[in-house]
Protein backbone atom coordinates (compact mmCIF):
# COMPACT_ATOMS: atom_id res chain seq x y z
CA UNK A 1 0.00 0.00 0.00
CA UNK A 2 1.30 3.42 -0.95
CA UNK A 3 1.00 6.29 1.51
CA UNK A 4 0.67 9.66 -0.18
CA UNK A 5 -0.20 13.20 0.79
CA UNK A 6 -2.48 13.67 -2.19
CA UNK A 7 -4.64 10.89 -3.64
CA UNK A 8 -6.14 12.89 -6.48
CA UNK A 9 -3.56 11.75 -9.04
CA UNK A 10 -3.64 8.15 -7.82
CA UNK A 11 -7.40 7.93 -8.27
CA UNK A 12 -7.05 8.43 -12.02
CA UNK A 13 -4.48 5.67 -12.54
CA UNK A 14 -7.13 2.97 -13.01
CA UNK A 15 -10.80 3.27 -13.84
CA UNK A 16 -11.90 0.90 -11.06
CA UNK A 17 -10.22 2.88 -8.27
CA UNK A 18 -12.62 3.93 -5.54
CA UNK A 19 -12.09 6.53 -2.85
CA UNK A 20 -13.41 5.48 0.57
CA UNK A 21 -13.19 7.02 4.00
CA UNK A 22 -12.59 4.69 6.93
CA UNK A 23 -11.89 5.76 10.50
CA UNK A 24 -11.07 9.30 9.40
CA UNK A 25 -8.53 8.20 6.80
CA UNK A 26 -9.00 8.30 3.05
CA UNK A 27 -8.13 5.21 1.03
CA UNK A 28 -7.99 4.24 -2.64
CA UNK A 29 -9.18 0.67 -3.15
CA UNK A 30 -9.27 -1.47 -6.27
CA UNK A 31 -10.74 -4.96 -6.13
CA UNK A 32 -9.61 -6.08 -9.58
CA UNK A 33 -6.02 -4.87 -9.18
CA UNK A 34 -5.00 -4.48 -5.52
CA UNK A 35 -1.60 -2.96 -6.35
CA UNK A 36 -3.32 0.42 -6.69
CA UNK A 37 -4.19 0.52 -2.99
CA UNK A 38 -3.18 3.74 -1.27
CA UNK A 39 -3.79 5.69 1.91
CA UNK A 40 -3.58 9.39 2.59
CA UNK A 41 -1.00 10.22 5.24
UniProtKB/Swiss-Prot annotation:
User: Entry's InterPro entries?
Assistant: Ribosomal_bL36, Ribosomal_bL36_sp, Ribosomal_L36_bact
Recorded superkingdom:
Bacteria
- List residues traversing the bilayer: none
GO MF terms, alphabetically ordered = structural constituent of ribosome
GO terms of biological process kind: translation
The record's Gene Ontology cellular component field reads:
ribonucleoprotein complex; ribosome
Tell whether Ribonucleoprotein is among the UniProt keywords: yes
One matching Pfam family is: Ribosomal_L36
Q: Keywords for this entry?
A: Ribonucleoprotein, Ribosomal protein
Record's HAMAP family?
Ribosomal_bL36
Matching PANTHER family, A to Z?
A: 50S RIBOSOMAL PROTEIN L36 2, LARGE RIBOSOMAL SUBUNIT PROTEIN BL36B
Q: Which family does it belong to?
A: Belongs to the bacterial ribosomal protein bL36 family.
Name of the protein described by the UniProt record: Large ribosomal subunit protein bL36
Amino acid sequence: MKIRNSLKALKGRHRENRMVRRKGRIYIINKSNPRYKARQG
